[in-house]
Amino acid sequence: KKIEILNADNTYANANIHPDYWRLIGNVSFLHNNAVMTCDSAYHYTYENKMEAFGEIKINQGDSITLTGEKLTYFGLENKADITGDVVLIDKHMTLKTNQVLYNLSTNIASYPNQGEIIDNEKIINSKRGAYHSNIHSFIFKDSVVVINKDYNILTDNMRYNSSSEVTYFFGPSFIISDNKTIYCENGWYNTKTDIAQFRENTYISTESYLLKGDSLYYNKNKQYGKAFSNVQLIDTVENMTVYGGIAEYFEEEEKIIISKKPMLELLFEKDTLFMHAKQFVSQQKPGEKKILAYPKVTFFKTDFQGKCDSLSYNFTDSVVEMF
C-alpha cells in the first residue's frame, strides 16, 4: 500500500535534479496503514514508498499509540518507523522516553536500542534496551534494569512486565530492595497489584540481623509473610548461628522465623560448636531480646557435654538456657 500525502503547504519536485523524491515543506501530514504522521518537512521517496521527516514528528495510530520525536524514517514497504531525538511514546498504560524508537506498525511492537525510561502508574523503569508490545501491554527489559517504586526498588539483568496484569517476571540475578530488607533471586515473578511473589534459584532474604536462604521463596508483602522451601538456611552472623531445614516460615511484623522439616542448628563458640536437633526451631527477636526456641524432642551435643529435653529456649541477650 502506497503512502498517501494528506497535506503539505509547499511541494517541490524536479525530475531532472532529484527524480526519486518529492520535497514537502510546512504542516506535512501523511497516512499509511491507518496511522497518521505529521512533521514540519519531509522527503517522499515515491518509488521506495519511503519518507524522511523532520521537525516536530508525531505518529497517531488510532486512539492507542502516540509517538513523537525530531526525525523519522518511515519504510512503507515494511511498515516500520525509526524515530530519533527526544522520543516519547504514550499509550493508555504508560509513557516511554528515550532517544530512539524502532516501531513496527504491523505488529505494534516498539523497541529502543539505547537507554529508555518507562513511567507506569507509580513506577519508573529504566533499562539500556527494551521492547513494548502494545497489543498485549507487555514489556521486555534488558541490561541494567532498574525499577523505582515508593516501597521498593528492583535491580535485574532481564525482566518482563505486563502493565495490564501488573506482573513482573525476573530472569538472571535480581535484587528487590526495600528499607529494611533485600530479596535476591535468579528467576521468579512479582505481582505488583497483589504484592504476592514467587522467587526461585539461589533465593534469600537479607536483613540487618540475618540471612534466610532457600531454593525457592513465596512472599506476601501485605501479610508480611514469606515461606522458603528446600535447602533452607537461617544464618545469624551476629550470634554465629546457622539453622538448616527443609521449610522456613517468615513473619516480618513479629520478627519471627519458624524452621521445620528435619531442622538442625549449629552455634559456633570460640573453640567449639554446639549442634542441636528438634522437630522445629523458632527464631524470634523483640526489642532488647533475641531468642531461639527448639521443640519437641530436642537433642544437643558439644565436645564437653550433651543432653536432651522436650523443649529448649536460649536467650542470646543474657545467654540463659531454659529446658523443659
Name the predicted role of every residue range.
Residues 1-324:
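N-terminal amphipathic/hydrophobic interface segments
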